[in-house]
Structures are given as C-alpha cells and as structure tokens.
C-alpha cells in the first residue's frame, strides 16, 4: 500500500471493469474466428483467449472466507505462466484479481444482517448503482443496541447527469447537449443538487444511524485520510461541506434521512473528462422565460480533478482506512457486486423507476414559468400544465410544450 501511494503520480490511468469485459469479448471473437479459419492455430488461439479469461479455479468464494485470490497449483506450466500474466495485468491496472461477485441471495443475506462492511460495485450502470445504493440503505437493519451498522458503498458510473429528487430539471440541465454527448439523465432518490459523472469520478456512500449522522463527518474523515498519506493534496472542507482543493470543488454531496437511518453520498473527481462536462448544466432556454420554483437550485462552483489519484487507488485507500477506523468486532469485509449476478426484484423495481420517464420528467416540485413577451404564465405540477392564461395549453405535458414552444406561442 505505501509503495502504491508514494507513486500516485506515476500510476496508470484507471481502466474500468467494463473495459476489461470489452477486451475479453474482443479476444473471444477473434479467437473463435481464427479457430474456424484454421484448426492448426488452435493451441496458440486458446492461449490468448485464456490470457484474458479469469479461470474459475482462481476465484475465491468470498473475501471474508479466507481463500486465496490466486491459486498456483496448476499442472501445466503454460497455464501457470498465463495465470501469472493475468494477475500481473490486473494488478498493474489496479483492478484487483478475480474478485468474487456476490449472488442475489448473498447480497440479501449480507445487507439484512447486522454488521459493518464495504461494498464495491463493479458495474458502471448508473441505474443499477443508484438502485443498489437504495437497496442497501432501505434494508440495513437498525441496531437496537451496541454499535450501529455503518456501511460504505463505492460505485463508478458511466456518463450521466444526476439531478436531485426535488429539482426542476428544466432549470438544471441542457437535455439536447446531454443527448448529443451520450449522457444519461437520472433523478436520484435523495435531495441535493445536480452532478455529472463519468468513469473518472468515484461515488461513495456512507450509511449510518440517524442518531450518529452528521453531514460533514465523513468528508472530514476522507480529507484527514488522504492528506495524511499525501500532504501535497491540500484538501479542505468549505462551509457547505464540499471537499475543495486550491479553491476548486472536487466533491459534491447529498443526503437522505429515513427510517432511523441516514446516508451521505458524494462524488470525487479524480480523472474525469471535464471538457465533456462543459455546457451540460447550462440550460439553453429562451431568454424571455422567467421561472418560479420551490425546488432545490444547484450552486454553481468551479471544479477540477484531484489528478494524482486514480479511482481504484481512492477506493483502496478509503476502504482500508474505513476498515481500521470503524472496526469493532472482527475485520470489516469488502464485497463486490454487479448488475448481472447481484440483482433481485427490489433492485430491478428501483432501476425501472429510475429509467422511467414518469420519474424523470413527471415528478419533482411545482413550478411556474412566465413567457414575458407573450404575456403568458404557465403553472406545472408533476410535469403537466394545470393552469395557464390559455385554456388550450391546460393538460399538456410541459416536456412536449417546451420541445415545440414555437408552435404554441
């Protein structure tokens, strides 16, 4: 760990789990084509296929069961060399080797039992990751006595804009630019402002009891942990509880409190493609529109990447310090999951909600908009126009009205 941390600036750029899956799929396709073309190359083709396919023999059951992540008891020297190469490849990119992914039943049993743990999602689907986070929060039991069941969840999302539950999306994002840059739009289950994610950003979620919850607590811990390992980072906390570096925001937070429990989830900009973020949070609406809304408005801030830490290094450091700091009885285990194996009906239902137009466009706060040069005032609730100076507009979807505003005005 210390060697890795002392060489942050030299570490390779993050390569996501999904990229590795794509690489595996490519090699499978190429080797199948080669085998069909000429069987005499079968052995060499199989070797390259295996180089990018973790063997089931090398996979541990679960980290907390104490089995080795790497098994060298192979009868073939070639297989030993290939397995060693695979391990070196994984370690070089800080992905880890042969992480055992929990099944749906394992996930349910672990989440619903008492105890502390870390979960890292290997999925980059924002719909799955937000649904997983929601599942862990809702199903974490309240501790009736003794230590609380605090948990830590990590996930990395592919390109997306995530607005708060109580935000008016029309004032927060440019839908056309999101679409042109292949960013998904999500409305999360918690409050707060709008944030942008990509594979260079890590999302973390700290869950604890309502009694022990304090909005700035976990970010203070992260600042302490990272600054102690590399003082050159100079991380600090602003008055809103956001983590900043040299006056630039590198982490934004949101919170949820329900059922005697609470969570603080936040972003951490490490190697994000900030050029792609440009303009996405600047709605391109006509200047003649004047808005009134009771919803939460995002606070615009200058942002930057931390730059000298990769996503996997950040996850490793914070996980290790969490394990040491919150250890009570026995070690705090780390578990892994994805949207293919670690999924159940409750997570699927949450994903369906997050993906639905009803949740994205037809929820959120009431608002009104005045089109000044037309003398027109429109009032909207749940995405529908319910009051207007013109009766022919009442009952229309506001989304459709805005997309065809020239024809209506």
From Swiss-Prot:
InterPro entries: aa-tRNA-synth_II/BPL/LPL, BPL_LPL_catalytic, LipoylTrfase_LipoateP_Ligase. This is Putative lipoate-protein ligase A. GO terms for cellular component: mitochondrion. Its EC number is 6.3.1.20. GO terms for molecular function: ATP binding; lipoate-protein ligase activity; lipoyltransferase activity. It is an enzyme of class 6 (ligase). Belongs to the LplA family. (R)-lipoate binds at residue 249. Pathway: Protein modification; protein lipoylation via exogenous pathway; protein N(6)-(lipoyl)lysine from lipoate: step 1/2; Protein modification; protein lipoylation via exogenous pathway; protein N(6)-(lipoyl)lysine from lipoate: step 2/2. ATP binds at residues 188, 193-196, 249. In the transfer reaction, the free carboxyl group of lipoic acid is attached via an amide linkage to the epsilon-amino group of a specific lysine residue of lipoyl domains of lipoate-dependent enzymes. Keywords: ATP-binding, Ligase, Nucleotide-binding. Catalyzes both the ATP-dependent activation of exogenously supplied lipoate to lipoyl-AMP and the transfer of the activated lipoyl onto the lipoyl domains of lipoate-dependent enzymes. Monomer. The keyword ATP-binding applies. GO terms for biological process: protein modification process. Residues 146-330 form the BPL/LPL catalytic domain.
């Amino acid at each position: 760990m210390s060697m890795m941390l002392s060489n942050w600036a030299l570490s390779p750029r993050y390569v996501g789990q999904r990229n590795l899956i794509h690489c595996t799929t490519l090699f499978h396709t190429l080797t199948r084509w080669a085998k069909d073309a000429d069987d005499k190359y079968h052995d060499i083709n199989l070797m390259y296929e295996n180089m990018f396919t973790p063997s089931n023999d090398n996979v541990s059951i679960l980290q907390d069961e104490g089995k080795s992540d790497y098994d060298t008891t192979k009868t073939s020297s070639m297989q030993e060399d290939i397995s060693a190469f695979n391990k070196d490849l994984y370690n070089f990119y800080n992905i880890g080797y042969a992480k055992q992914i929990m099944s749906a039943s394992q996930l349910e049993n672990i989440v619903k039992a008492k105890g502390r743990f870390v979960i890292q999602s290997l999925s980059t689907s924002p719909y799955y990751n937000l649904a997983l986070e929601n599942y862990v929060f809702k199903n974490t039991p309240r501790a009736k006595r003794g230590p609380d069941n605090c948990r830590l969840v990590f996930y990395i999302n592919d390109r997306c804009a995530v607005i708060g539950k109580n935000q008016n999306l029309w004032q927060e994002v440019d839908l056309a630019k999101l679409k042109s840059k292949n960013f998904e739009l999500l409305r999360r289950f918690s409050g707060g402002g709008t944030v942008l994610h990509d594979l260079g950003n890590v999302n973390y979620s700290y869950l604890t009891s309502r009694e022990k919850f304090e909005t700035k607590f976990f970010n203070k811990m992260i600042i302490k942990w990272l600054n102690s390992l590399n003082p050159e980072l100079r991380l600090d906390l602003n008055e809103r509880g956001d983590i900043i570096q040299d006056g630039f925001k590198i982490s934004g937070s949101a919170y949820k409190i329900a059922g005697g429990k609470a969570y603080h989830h936040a972003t951490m900009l490490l190697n994000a493609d900030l050029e792609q973020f440009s303009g996405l949070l600047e709605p391109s609406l006509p200047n003649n529109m004047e808005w009134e809304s009771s919803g939460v408005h995002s606070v615009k801030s200058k942002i930057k990447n931390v730059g000298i830490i990769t996503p996997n290094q950040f996850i490793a450091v914070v996980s290790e310090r969490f394990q040491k700091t919150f250890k009570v009885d026995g070690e705090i285990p780390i578990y892994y999951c994805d949207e293919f194996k670690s999924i159940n009906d409750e997570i699927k239902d949450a994903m369906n909600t997050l993906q639905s137009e009803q949740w994205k466009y037809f929820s959120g706060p009431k608002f009104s908009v005045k089109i000044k040069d037309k003398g027109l005032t429109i009032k909207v609730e749940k995405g529908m126009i319910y009051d207007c100076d013109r009766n022919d507009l009442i009952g229309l979807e506001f989304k459709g009205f805005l997309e065809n505003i020239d024809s209506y005005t």
